């Protein structure tokens, strides 16, 4: 795996390609700087990784175990911690920062975050089931239809698509393109949409698979 960066979704806008004039929809993400709060090596933990923090808060917002952990790296109090496994963590030191210059325009990235929670939703909204006839006399407008067979097996199989909570799950959108980097304001502009609503916490890493 590769080192990534944590950020917050600010919203969407559009920029124009200087050569073609085509409007490009982009998501603006405020990312970093993320201090390195822990370095793990095979000698200490059995594997290589670094832990980074994001989202400065006051000390009173954190509990004592977390404050004690952060004081070992002399890091400022941060709300979120995230670990990235590496092949070799010797190149990183406690207190170093991960910034948006980790990426450059044209890079492909994977963006992970929590989708917008939509609460308890029905079959059509949650699973795109076909709606029943809306004509006079129809008693099936938004019903699910059959949920299984008869006496055998005599039960509904686990995993059957039914009504329930929709959204609010961790997802990863892969191979998005970095359009622009603003190192002064710690901003990354990524082509297309990313999970969640404005204010959502995101993890941005170099694309795991590159190609078709």
Swiss-Prot record:
Ranges that cross the membrane: none
Keywords, sorted A to Z: Ribonucleoprotein, Ribosomal protein, RNA-binding, rRNA-binding
Classification via InterPro entries: Ribosomal_uL3 (IPR000597), Ribosomal_uL3_bac/org-type (IPR019927), Ribosomal_uL3_CS (IPR019926), Transl_B-barrel_sf (IPR009000)
GO biological process, one term: translation
A GO term, aspect molecular function: rRNA binding
Origin superkingdom: Bacteria
Region annotation Disordered: where it falls in the sequence: 130-158
An annotated GO cellular component: cytosolic large ribosomal subunit
Pfam family of the protein (one): Ribosomal_L3
PROSITE patterns linked to this entry: RIBOSOMAL_L3
HAMAP family assigned to the protein according to its UniProt record, in alphabetical order: Ribosomal_uL3_B
Function: One of the primary rRNA binding proteins, it binds directly near the 3'-end of the 23S rRNA, where it nucleates assembly of the 50S subunit.
Known partners and oligomeric status: Part of the 50S ribosomal subunit. Forms a cluster with proteins L14 and L19.
The family this protein is said to belong to: Belongs to the universal ribosomal protein uL3 family.
Protein name: Large ribosomal subunit protein uL3
The species this protein was found in: Gloeothece citriformis (strain PCC 7424)
């Amino acid at each position: 795996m590769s080192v990534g960066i944590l950020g917050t979704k600010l919203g969407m806008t559009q920029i124009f390609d200087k050569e073609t004039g085509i409007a490009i929809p982009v998501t603006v993400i405020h990312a970093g700087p993320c201090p390195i709060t822990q370095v793990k090596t095979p000698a200490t933990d059995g594997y290589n990784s670094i832990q980074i923090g994001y989202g400065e808060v006051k000390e009173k917002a954190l509990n004592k175990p977390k404050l004690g952990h952060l004081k070992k790296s002399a890091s400022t109090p941060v709300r979120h911690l995230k670990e990235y496994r590496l092949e070799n963590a010797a190149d990183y030191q406690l207190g170093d920062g991960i910034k948006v210059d980790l990426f450059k325009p044209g890079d492909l990235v994977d963006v992970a975050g929590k989708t917008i929670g939509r609460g308890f939703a029905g079959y059509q909204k949650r699973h795109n089931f076909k709606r029943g006839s809306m004509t006079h006399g129809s008693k099936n407008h938004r019903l699910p239809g059959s949920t299984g067979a008869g006496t055998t097996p005599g039960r509904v199989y686990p995993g059957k698509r039914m009504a329930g909570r929709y959204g609010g799950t961790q997802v990863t959108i892969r191979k998005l393109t970095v359009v622009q980097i603003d190192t002064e304001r710690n901003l990354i502009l990524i082509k297309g949409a990313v999970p969640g609503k404005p204010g959502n916490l995101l993890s941005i890493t170099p694309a795991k698979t590159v190609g078709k």
